[in-house]
Amino acid sequence: MSAPLVIVAPPGHPLAHLKKIPLKRLQEEVFLVREPGSGTRSAMERFFAEREIHLKTGMEVGSNEAIKQSVQAGLGLGLLSRATIEQELELKRLVVLDVAEFPIMRHWYMVHRRGKRLSPVARAFHDFVLSEAKQLVGSGLARTKPQRHHNTDRAGRPK
C-alpha cells in the first residue's frame, strides 16, 4: 500500500496558498520531526540529503499526533503520512503544502510466511487490512499490489 508523505502547515501559514514551492525555500522554515530511527524521519532525511537541502529542526517528537498538534499551534512545519491527517484536513486545521517533488512515496507491506496457514485471528486481520486498503485505493492514497521500489533489492532492502 502506498503511503504518500506530505508537508503540512497551519492554514494561515505564509506558504499555505503558494504553488510548487521550491525545496530550497523550505530551508527557511522550522520543521517538527519524528524521533531518530522513525521510518518517516529516515525517509525525510534521505529525500532532502539527496537534494542537498538542509532543514532546521525545531523539535523532535515521538508521535504523529504530537507533530499534528504542534503544527496546528504554529510551531513549525511537519512531514506526515497523508493517511494520518485526513480529519485535520477536513476540519481545516492543517493544509498540505504544494511543494516541488512532493509527495515522498513510501510503501507499507503486509507479509507472512509462504506456505504457512494463518490463524483465524491473523486471517481476519489480514482481510480487514486489505479491505481498508482497497477503500484507500479509491481515494488515490493507496495501492494494494506491492511493487518493488527502484531503490530496493528483490527482498525490499535498500540497495
Regions found by a protein language model. Give the residues of each.
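Hydrophobic hinge/microswitch elements
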Residues: 37-97, 153
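Flexible hinge/capping segments at coil-to-helix
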Residues: 1-31
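Ligand-binding clefts/hinges and TM-proximal coupling segments of bilobed small-molecule sensing domains
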Residues: 37-47, 53, 129-159
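A late-sequence structural motif
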Residues: 16, 39, 95-139
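Alpha-helical segments flanking ligand/cofactor-binding loops in enzyme cores
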Residues: 24, 68-69, 123
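Active-site-adjacent beta-strand anchor residues
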Residues: 8, 33-34, 60, 78, ...
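Short secondary-structure boundary segments
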Residues: 11, 82-84, 101, 108
